């Protein structure tokens, strides 16, 4: 399943979530879309405006704490096999 992370470059919460995605080896499973540029219309279509926000194909999860819990529960997809 491919997830979509809507983020803002200058937003500290978004930056921490992007870093966490990479640290957990989840980047191959999560597409990053900037909510101020390429992801703006899609985020609005999904009924969102706040970031960070994670779309799982059914639901928009909003906020650093909630997204952090989701990320922690996902299995890693790391190139190094760890």
Region annotations inferred by a language model:
Residues 31-49, 77:
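Thioredoxin-like thiol-disulfide oxidoreductase module
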Residues 10, 35-36, 59-60:
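Short beta->alpha junction loops/turns
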Residues 1-33:
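Local sequence-structure signature of Cys/Sec-based thiol-disulfide redox active-site neighborhoods
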Residues 55-82:
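Non-catalytic, surface beta->alpha helical segment in thiol-disulfide oxidoreductase systems
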Residues 13, 17, 39, 63-70:
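Amphipathic alpha-helical interface surfaces
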């Amino acid at each position: 399943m491919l997830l979509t992370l809507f983020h803002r470059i200058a937003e500290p919460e978004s930056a921490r979530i992007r870093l966490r995605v990479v640290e957990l080896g989840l980047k191959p499973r999560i597409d990053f879309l900037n909510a101020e540029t390429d992801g703006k219309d899609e985020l609005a279509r999904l009924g969102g405006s706040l970031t960070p926000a994670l779309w799982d194909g059914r639901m928009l999860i909003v906020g650093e704490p909630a997204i952090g819990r989701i990320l922690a529960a996902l299995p890693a997809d790391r190139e190094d096999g760890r």
